[in-house]
């Protein structure tokens, strides 16, 4: 799924990038995927207040804007101050509506939902369109996580999400695997899982996220 850029310069850049990628790509199932071109999309990042959903949404917004798309955003902060982790009152979200034409609202229903835990899924799932893309962090769906979200069964196993395109991703395990060479402790690596999810969304939308995120977190010289 890719948004068509508005700027001719951006189109030329993307064509050049794709040509360079094709020259080195191997013939894999991923390399044979043909993205569906659409003119707009609404995406929502949702998780605990400490999961970095606001910065993740902001970075995604910056990149989308660099590609020449019109945007409207809706940051959603919980009313509670530091609600217990994993609970319904502590869910934070960031919604972005971006398009190749003018955008006037952040959107009502969403095309893509990224849920970092069961509470985020429960609070936001009603807004996801049928056949919408649902990405969940399966590492956070343990018994204790489900109990905090007031769930009695695991929604990833009871077919209640069958009307969506569900991608159950081990975000914590994959993030740790990607960062294991840096010598970070487990807690520090787990704090980066929001940017792993951000990278997945860049790929999903055929965006080169490097331009919007490469300087984030670097100390200014």
Model-flagged regions — what are they?
Residues 2-221:
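Active-site cofactor/cluster-binding pocket
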């Amino acid at each position: 799924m890719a948004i068509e850029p508005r700027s001719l310069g951006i189109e030329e850049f993307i064509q050049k990038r794709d040509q360079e990628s094709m020259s080195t790509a191997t013939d894999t199932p991923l390399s044979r995927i043909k993205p569906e071109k659409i003119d707009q999309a609404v995406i929502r990042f949702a998780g605990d207040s400490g999961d970095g959903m606001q910065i993740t949404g902001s970075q995604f917004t910056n990149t989308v804007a660099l590609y020449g798309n019109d945007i409207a955003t809706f940051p959603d902060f919980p009313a509670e101050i530091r609600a217990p982790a994993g609970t319904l009152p502590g869910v934070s979200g960031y919604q972005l509506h971006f398009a190749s034409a003018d955008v006037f609202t952040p959107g009502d229903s969403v095309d893509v939902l990224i849920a970092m835990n069961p509470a985020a899924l429960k609070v936001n799932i009603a807004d996801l369109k049928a056949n919408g893309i649902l990405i969940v962090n399966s590492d956070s769906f343990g018994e204790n996580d489900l109990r905090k979200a007031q769930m009695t069964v695991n929604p990833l196993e009871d077919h209640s999400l069958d009307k969506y395109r569900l991608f159950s991703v081990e975000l914590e395990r994959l993030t740790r695997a990607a960062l294991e060479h840096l010598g970070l402790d487990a807690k520090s690596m787990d704090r980066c899982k929001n940017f792993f999810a951000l990278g997945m969304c860049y790929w999903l939308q055929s965006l080169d996220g490097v331009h919007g995120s490469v300087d984030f977190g670097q100390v200014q010289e």
